[in-house]
């Protein structure tokens, strides 16, 4: 019932004009460095935060478990996504490390595609989410870019510490090379923690004096465990992802404090 309520509400929310949202919420616009926060996005994030708290799906930093992780992921997958690909997207799970059952999911089209490949890492603070949650994102990328997308189901913290995810990213990159892609054809991409993993992979390749891939695309990346950013002080509360959340993600991602100094 709660999923029906949320989906029904969101179907109405996205057709409301900006003036209607202002009348209904009475929220003021937020400006940061002379840039105005998109009003619809601001209200949407606040509402999603409220829904998550209301239905007991907020990240419990004091008592985190895999059951909570699965509950959060299942909730996200039941929320309707109005932006779905119009073309048929083919999906195939490749086992690229049989010992650890490491999955690399390939998204492709029936029609002729670009010769490039996107190696994609999902977000979630290295602790939550999975390739199933990001299935709509990867599918839309495949259709929009007319390119094969390879989405990695990397190991999550706190069960798996740094550099486990990076090691698996290297395995995925090498798998693409061994299956016909040159480095000039590979694009490394990720969002949030996935963007940090993408950047880490390139730093790791560079440290080993290896040729780098064609391009990296970092979507709102996790950047530094120092969390010393004016934007985080200004926007560190009331926007779903808080400064305390980021402290928690970084803390459980690293194996030891010395990892903060690792260039990867």
Question: What is the role of each PLM region?
Answer:
Residues 1-109, 259:
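A glycine/proline-hinged amphipathic helix-loop "lid/cap" segment
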Residues 6-15, 19, 92-264:
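Alpha/beta-hydrolase superfamily serine-hydrolase fold, recognizing
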């Amino acid at each position: 019932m709660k999923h029906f309520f949320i989906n029904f509400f969101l179907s109405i929310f996205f057709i409301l004009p900006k003036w209607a949202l202002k009348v209904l919420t009475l929220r003021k616009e937020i400006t940061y460095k002379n840039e105005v926060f998109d009003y619809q996005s601001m209200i949407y994030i606040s509402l999603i935060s409220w829904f998550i708290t209301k239905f007991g799906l907020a990240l419990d930093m004091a008592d985190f478990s895999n059951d909570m992780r699965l509950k959060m992921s299942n909730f996200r997958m039941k929320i309707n996504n109005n932006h779905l690909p119009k073309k048929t997207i083919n999906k195939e799970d490749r086992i690229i490390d049989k010992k650890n059952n490491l999955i690399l999911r390939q998204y492709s089209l029936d029609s002729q595609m670009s010769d490039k490949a996107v190696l994609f890492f999902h977000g979630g603070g290295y602790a939550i989410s999975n390739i199933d949650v990001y299935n709509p994102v990867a599918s839309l990328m495949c259709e929009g870019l007319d390119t094969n997308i390879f989405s990695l189901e990397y190991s999550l913290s706190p069960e798996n510490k740094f550099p486990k995810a990076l090691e698996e990213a290297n395995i995925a990159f090498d798998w693409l090379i061994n299956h016909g892609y040159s480095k000039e054809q590979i694009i490394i991409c990720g969002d949030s923690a996935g963007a940090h993993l993408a950047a880490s992979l390139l730093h790791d390749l560079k440290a080993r004096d290896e040729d780098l891939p064609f391009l990296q695309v970092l979507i709102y990346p996790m950047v530094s465990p120092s969390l010393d950013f004016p934007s985080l002080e200004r926007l560190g509360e009331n926007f779903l992802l808080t400064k305390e959340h980021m402290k928690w993600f970084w803390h459980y991602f690293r194996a030891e404090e010395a990892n903060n100094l690792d260039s990867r």
